[in-house]
């Protein structure tokens, strides 16, 4: 059985694919989640997160851009952008404590991002959580 952490990692993968230009990724979410063994409640959780990010992508991206220090949104790595989008959505619209969301994002970034990514992600998300 998949965990919420694994479900979030799958959502980051979906957002990553979307960001790389796969605009029809939404048509394949069920297949992708099944392939990653994200099922039942965790599948519902993952779909809720993915659909929530996509439905709120403009305010999510605006919050990220507002808190980037000396960075251009388009220059962010696709993994970092996907992770920031998911975590920002959860901070702004979710029910979890921001510290938990930030920790999850940092852990996901450790798995997918560069060596410097976790610190960067932590800083941006901390600023977003303080400003919400």
From Swiss-Prot:
The keyword Nucleotide-binding does not apply. Belongs to the NusB family. This is Transcription antitermination protein NusB. One of its GO terms (biological process) is DNA-templated transcription termination. The keyword Oxidoreductase does not apply. GO terms for cellular component: cytosol. It comes from Sulfurimonas denitrificans (strain ATCC 33889 / DSM 1251). The gene is nusB. Gene3D superfamilies: NusB-like (1.10.940.10). Keywords: RNA-binding, Transcription, Transcription antitermination, Transcription regulation. Involved in transcription antitermination. Required for transcription of ribosomal RNA (rRNA) genes. Binds specifically to the boxA antiterminator sequence of the ribosomal RNA (rrn) operons. One of its GO terms (molecular function) is RNA binding. Pfam families: NusB (PF01029). Signal peptide: none annotated. It comes from the Bacteria. InterPro entries: NusB-like_sf, NusB_fam, NusB_RsmB_TIM44.
């Amino acid at each position: 059985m998949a965990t919420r952490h694994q479900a979030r990692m799958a959502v980051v993968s979906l957002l990553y694919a979307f960001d790389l230009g796969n605009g029809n990724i939404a048509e394949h979410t069920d297949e992708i989640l099944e392939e990653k063994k994200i099922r039942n409640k965790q599948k519902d959780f993952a779909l809720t997160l993915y659909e929530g990010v996509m439905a709120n992508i403009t305010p999510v991206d605006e919050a990220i851009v507002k808190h980037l220090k000396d960075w251009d949104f388009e220059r962010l790595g696709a993994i970092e952008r996907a992770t920031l989008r998911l975590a920002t959505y959860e901070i702004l619209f979710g029910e979890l404590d921001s510290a938990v969301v930030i920790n999850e994002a940092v852990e996901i970034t450790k798995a997918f991002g560069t060596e410097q990514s976790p610190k960067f992600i932590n800083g941006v998300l901390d600023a977003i959580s303080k400003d919400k």
